[in-house]
Regions:
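Blade-terminus and WD-like Trp-Asp/Gly-His loop motifs, strongest in beta-propeller folds
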Residues: 15-21, 60-69, 113-121, 192-199, ...
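Hydrophobic or amphipathic alpha-helical targeting/insertion segments
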Residues: 70-132
Length: 393
């Protein structure tokens, strides 16, 4: 493989579906501009078409109430061009048919966003420069400052200069209010936010009282304040299932090494295991039509499971990166050692490829099928994927 072949290697993510339509994010390297290009593709009536591309990056698509309404984040692309603005602007757009409307814009990054239950508002999680840095013109050239010497042990690297905030945005009027100020509450990052029976609930990171490490907490937003629900674990991917708050992660952060799993969180802050006997890492969970689906790791693969009925939806030598639902159909982003990212329709455990995202790459680069082998060392068993050669392979 030549290094320039990577120009045609596409990484797929953020697959969403509604009605008969799919939208996916595709990211690839660009050696000419020394940056990454992120685009959106849309599948309607069985055909894929470029949805958003150009001089900016487009990411994190979400459907509105109607099938023809799609929200997405637009970010100015980082390139080695001194004539371009040094400010990083992130914007949420709403596209209904051919009409494009700007909903929200901020200097910094938009980590995530979600629509309110009534569809009238939007909750936006941002990662912005802390107040001490906001007046510095060229922030990328500013030297590093360490607030805490053991910053390498907080699992986040150098995070001295950003704080996370939450905005509530009226989609029709575009007016917004900052309901969580990360500067005043010293919130380093917000992993997840969900609206449900407890109102708005979020998982977030703050330094502990000694400033030696980050603590991951879950709290409910009440009048711009955060009422702490739980602070002993390491959790994200908040969601409601059967009218109860759930999360994916560990009940106690120092239980590692152990499996990340689905946890149920009561109104009083008690945390219990949803699947106590399931001994695999669960990495993502989502509820669709009252059924809980999750991705879990097993022997070097990532598979999709119906957690409500305790049924594996696929048992192949593939890694499922993401999944989405479209009417009564299930679609996944899957890859293997010999097949880079593609989108497949999943039906009765069988995968049918419906995309050609990496067709150009696989024509240029020869790939190999790897074999799975569990090797017994006498003291432990090791899951191995490889190309076994020689007469004793």
């Amino acid at each position: 493989m030549k290094p320039t072949d990577l120009n045609s290697f596409n990484t797929l993510s953020n697959l969403v579906g509604k009605g008969t339509t799919l939208v996916v994010q595709s990211t690839r390297m660009d050696f000419e501009t020394n940056t990454y290009i992120s685009e959106l593709w849309k599948r309607s009536n069985g055909q894929w078409k470029s949805f958003k591309t150009g001089n900016n990056n487009f990411s994190n698509p979400k459907f509105g109430d109607k099938e023809n309404t799609v929200f997405y984040i637009k970010t100015n692309r980082s390139v080695q061009d001194k004539s371009r603005s040094k400010k990083t602007l992130s914007t949420i757009h709403m596209q209904a048919g051919r009409s494009i409307d700007t909903i929200f814009e901020v200097e910094g990054g938009i980590s995530n966003y979600s629509l309110s239950k009534d569809g009238k508002s939007m909750y936006v999680i941002t990662s912005e420069w802390s107040k001490e840095f906001k007046n510095i013109e060229d922030k990328n050239s500013e030297p590093m400052y360490y607030e805490n010497l053991p910053f390498r042990f907080d699992t986040r690297g150098i995070i001295y200069n950003k704080r996370a905030h939450v905005y509530k945005v009226n989609i029709r009027t575009k007016k917004f209010t900052k309901i969580i100020d990360g500067d005043t509450k010293d919130i380093i990052s917000i992993e997840s936010l969900v609206e449900g029976g407890k109102g708005l609930v979020l998982s977030f990171d703050q330094y502990n009282s000694k400033g030696t490490m980050l603590e991951e907490k879950i709290g409910a937003i009440e009048s711009s304040k955060i009422k702490e629900i739980y602070s002993k674990g390491s959790m994200g991917n908040l969601f409601y299932y059967e009218d109860e708050l759930h999360a994916v992660g560990m009940r106690k952060r120092f239980d590692w090494p152990t499996n990340t799993t689905v946890l149920k969180i009561s109104n009083t802050g008690n945390v219990s295991y949803k699947y106590r006997s399931f001994d695999r890492n669960i990495v993502k969970a989502e509820v669709n039509e009252d059924i809980l689906y999750f991705l879990y790791e097993d022997s070097g693969k990532t598979l999709l499971r119906d957690g409500t009925n305790n049924v594996d939806l696929i048992n192949s030598d593939v890694t499922i990166k993401d999944f989405a639902f479209n009417n009564e159909q299930t679609f996944v982003i899957a890859n293997s050692f010999s097949n880079p990212d593609e989108i497949y329709e999943l039906n009765n455990g069988q995968l049918t490829k419906i995309s050609k995202a990496n067709e150009s790459f696989t024509k240029k680069v020869k790939t190999w099928d790897c074999e799975y082998e569990r090797i017994d060392t006498g003291k432990s068993e090791i899951d191995t994927w490889g190309i076994f050669v020689g007469k004793d392979k």
